[in-house]
Amino acid sequence: MPLTLRELTADELPASWALGRMAFGGPAEAPARALRVVPGMTRLGAFDERGTLVGKVVDVAHEQWWGGRRVVAADVSGVAVRPETRGGGVARQLLTELLVRARERGAAVSALYPTVSAVYRSLGWEVAGSLGATELDTAALPRTRAVDGLTVRPGEPDELPLVTELYERVARQRQGLLTRRGGHFDEAPDTPLPEGVDALSLVFDGDLLVGALVFGRGTGYGVESKLDVHHLLATTPDAARALVGVLAGWTTVTRAVRVPLLAGDVFSTVLPLERASAGSATAWMHRPVDVVRAVADRGWPAHVTGRVSFRLRDDVAPWNAGDWELEVADGAATLRRAATEPDLWLDVRGFAVLYCAATGGRALGQTGLAGGSGDPAALDLLACGPRAELLDYF
């Protein structure tokens, strides 16, 4: 089917919402945020010969933290295709166009949450992690009080920028987390608190915010009642213990609390995780938009030095394909065209998994995403550093 691919106009956003609602469900009336033009966000549409919108995709234009540096991302959301045209390659054309446009605007990497992973695998994305949360019985939480020098108090809506600054102190040395700056993050909310948030509890050390609990109360106070924590942040063990004590104070009216955690973060050393009653995990996928930028723009472990050459396969983004040499030194890295033919090869999906430190070279070789006559353990250089994580759904 011949398609016209272009950016949607403001007048076409209601039709875009209707298409998304058909795919994912939702209210008949679009929320105001869905009908606004957001700076930096690119909404692409596919139109048939009659001018009917038959598919759409959104480039959310985030930035991700990688080793203390901001990396421009083309994170993907809202992929939807009309049922009459599904299976006809509409999504493939839209996502290929998104990658071309994203590279032109300077994007280096891309993440998404798949509904059907096979579609995205065929286009070079691969599962590299999961967005998770842990559910705990509030009665199992230690009732810890704040130590001298810390102040625990309710937060106000106008203090949310302080929470963002605290998040940045936590997130910037990790891999893959959104910066939560720019685009829709800078938009004024329609309500004093974000959707689903009822209150904040803050911990101060003097004038410095060192801990924040942002949560939704939920409904009821019986056995099914649950506190839904949106953000749980701290930069010191004492601040973490103080916030866990606040959560424990909900024992009489909420039987469970659902908390997002980062691997090895300060709350992981304070909470009784062995008492977790349930959890959830939503897979996310990653891919390079431009491999040269993806390597050069991020921070790398300062103690790692090395080189490895490989042939990269990328049929969808041909500018990434070819023979490359990766060199890492002094907390930085470069990717240059290899002078000689490499003895290792790497599929772009394998590049994504290694880049996110989700596996090593030899294990990747068992998946068929890497190979060659050389030892695939040499590809561990691309995977050096902490594993990538996400805390935001989009």
Question: What residue ranges belong to the model's regions?
Answer:
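Short amphipathic alpha-helix that is part of the acyltransferase structural core
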Residues: 1-61, 66-75, 141-184, 226-227
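Intrinsically disordered, low-complexity, positively biased terminal segments
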Residues: 2, 9, 149-394
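GNAT/GCN5-related N-acetyltransferase fold signature
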Residues: 46, 59, 81, 203, ...
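Conserved active-site alpha-helix within GNAT-family acetyltransferase domains
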Residues: 103-108, 114-132, 264-280
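Aromatic-anchored glycine-rich loop motif in surface-exposed flexible loops
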Residues: 129-130, 136-144
